[in-house]
A protein has these predicted regions:
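A short acidic, leucine-rich amphipathic alpha-helix
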Residues: 57-61
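C-terminal helical "lid" subdomain and adjoining coupling/linker elements of P-loop NTPases
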Residues: 29-34, 62, 89, 93
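Interdomain motor-coupling "hinge/lid" segment immediately C-terminal to the ATP-binding subdomain
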Residues: 1-53
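Phosphate-coordinating catalytic segments in nucleotide- and nucleic-acid-processing enzymes
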Residues: 9, 62, 69
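A cross-kingdom feature that marks ATP-driven nucleic-acid transaction machinery
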Residues: 76-176
């Protein structure tokens, strides 16, 4: 695959080309041709905001996609292509889970660093993305929590919360 080739060669174009191939083959071809540009914009948005909350309503406002259902459909297609994943906010109310923004993660940090729009390394968000990908392999239900405090990941198996995980690049008094 292309990702190991990037590690060996170090050529950032390899990751960009691989990302474009996945985007066209697994996402864009499933939609009408006029949505190609907006899908690329949504993709860039997700890459640039990895490990941050995202609202489908805000994405529809920022792009040419005026129908929120279309934005949701694009996000679902990204998930089916194993390119992006979205987790809900933990709440005991399903309605509140559905109403709150989701946090998005990318299958590979190489795509985030090579294709995404960034001004800094933002190691904390990249680390959180790596932790998410590893947690995804556990097959547990993954949520984030925000309320009186925040927690990057809340894991659930059946009706039991099994873990709460906070990811941080640097631990200090402000983020304990």
């Amino acid at each position: 695959g292309g990702i190991p080739k990037f590690v060996v060669d170090g050529d950032s174009r390899i990751l960009s080309e691989l990302y474009e191939n996945i985007l066209y083959r697994d996402v864009i071809k499933r939609f009408k041709p006029h949505l190609e540009k907006p899908i690329k914009e949504v993709s860039l948005y997700f890459l640039s905001t990895v490990a941050k909350r995202c609202s489908f309503r805000n994405i529809s406002v920022a792009t040419e996609i005026k129908n929120i259902a279309t934005v949701k459909s694009i996000a679902d297609t990204f998930e089916k292509a194993f390119l992006f994943f979205f987790i809900p906010k933990f709440d005991f109310s399903l309605q509140k889970q559905l109403q709150n923004p989701r946090k998005g993660y990318c299958v590979d940090n190489g795509f985030v660093t090579q294709v995404g729009f960034r001004f800094s390394e933002d190691r904390g968000r990249l680390l959180e993305n790596v932790v998410f990908i590893e947690l995804k392999r556990t097959k547990k239900e993954i949520y984030y929590f925000s309320g009186k405090g925040e927690c990057d990941f809340v894991l659930r198996v059946g009706s039991k919360i099994t873990d709460a995980i906070q990811v941080t690049w640097e631990l200090n008094e402000n983020n304990r």
